[in-house]
């Protein structure tokens, strides 16, 4: 299934939706630099872009920025961002408990 998104972004390199999907795939693969390249071509105000930027910031350890992106995406109706925000809150609690 990921191959479909890879092909789509190669065929339509400036399409915002193709870039959002490709960014999500790269985040799953752990290629944060490539995900940034795709996110930079996506619609900056789309809820999916904001959510993916939140995931990126979370993976980079920038919880404050991640929270901001998740809240913005959630305000635009992203259910995924709400779930990610909840996970981030749990991570902060774990970090506080375990002294990270």
Task: Place the predicted regions along the sequence by residue.
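Canonical positions in the second alpha-helix
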Residues: 7-8, 38-42, 72-73
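Short coil turns that delineate tetratricopeptide repeat
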Residues: 13, 44-47, 76-78
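Start-of-helix register in tetratricopeptide repeats
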Residues: 17, 48, 80-82
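Register position in tetratricopeptide repeats
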Residues: 28, 59, 87-95
């Amino acid at each position: 299934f990921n191959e479909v998104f890879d092909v789509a972004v190669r065929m339509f390199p400036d399409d915002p939706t193709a870039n959002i999907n490709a960014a999500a795939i790269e985040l799953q693969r752990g290629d944060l630099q490539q995900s940034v390249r795709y996110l930079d071509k996506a619609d900056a105000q789309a809820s999916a872009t904001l959510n993916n930027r939140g995931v990126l910031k979370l993976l980079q350890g920038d919880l404050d920025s991640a929270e901001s992106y998740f809240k913005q995406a959630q305000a635009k109706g992203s259910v995924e961002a709400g779930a990610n925000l909840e996970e981030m809150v749990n991570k902060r609690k774990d970090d506080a408990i375990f002294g990270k």
